[in-house]
Regions:
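Short alpha-helix plus adjacent loop in nuclease-associated cores
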Residues: 89-134
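RNase H-like, metal-dependent nuclease domains and their acidic two-metal-ion catalytic environment used
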Residues: 1-92, 131-177
Length: 177
């Protein structure tokens, strides 16, 4: 399995609202275990970003899943590194590397402002919904998506205004991972 995180770096925002941090963990295909399904949804904004980072770290360690982060918000990466768990942070997946991607990039995660990544993210969710949510009309199989908040987030998702859609961002990152 693997995970995706939509993180934040500031403890509090000016207006006190701010977006939540979000984490999804996903079981990839496996012959013996439930696969192609999300197994964890977490969305919260604790008073300190460090608390969110630690919650994500504990989830990654408990499940043994590496996670994909947005590399423009690096507080979570610093937290994992300071605790000695940077091995749980994924590098940019090969299928998301473009010709412009440097070969030896040391930064973990992927850029959330890259148009290639934004498009791949939207396509990953679209494909997942088509193949694993509801009834697959071609096979007759019933998909398993147990997290209603994520489903609602997907319904309202606006690719041109992604700020409010924390669950969509983290779920998409998990699928890209």
């Amino acid at each position: 399995g693997c995970g995706g995180v939509d993180s934040y770096d500031l403890d509090m925002t000016v207006d006190g609202r701010g977006s939540k941090g979000a984490l999804h963990l996903y079981n990839k295909f496996h012959m013996e275990h439930p696969s192609n399904m999300f197994v964890l949804e977490y969305a919260s904004r604790p008073p300190l970003a460090k608390i969110f980072y630690e919650d994500v770290l504990m989830s990654a360690v408990f499940y043994g899943y590496p996670i994909l982060i947005e590399n423009n918000k690096y507080g979570i990466a610093r937290h994992f590194e300071s605790r000695g768990y940077d091995g749980y942070l994924m590098a940019r997946p090969d299928h998301l590397k473009s010709a412009n991607t440097k070969i030896n990039v040391k930064t973990k995660g992927i850029p959330s402002n890259s148009q290639d990544v934004i498009q791949a993210h939207a396509h990953a969710i679209e494909a997942y919904v088509h193949n694993h949510v509801g009834i697959n009309r071609e096979t007759g199989e019933v998909g398993r998506m147990y997290f209603n908040k994520t489903l609602e987030d997907w319904i309202g998702f606006d690719i041109n205004n992604r700020t409010k859609f924390d669950l969509t961002i983290s779920a998409g990152l998990a699928l890209l991972a």
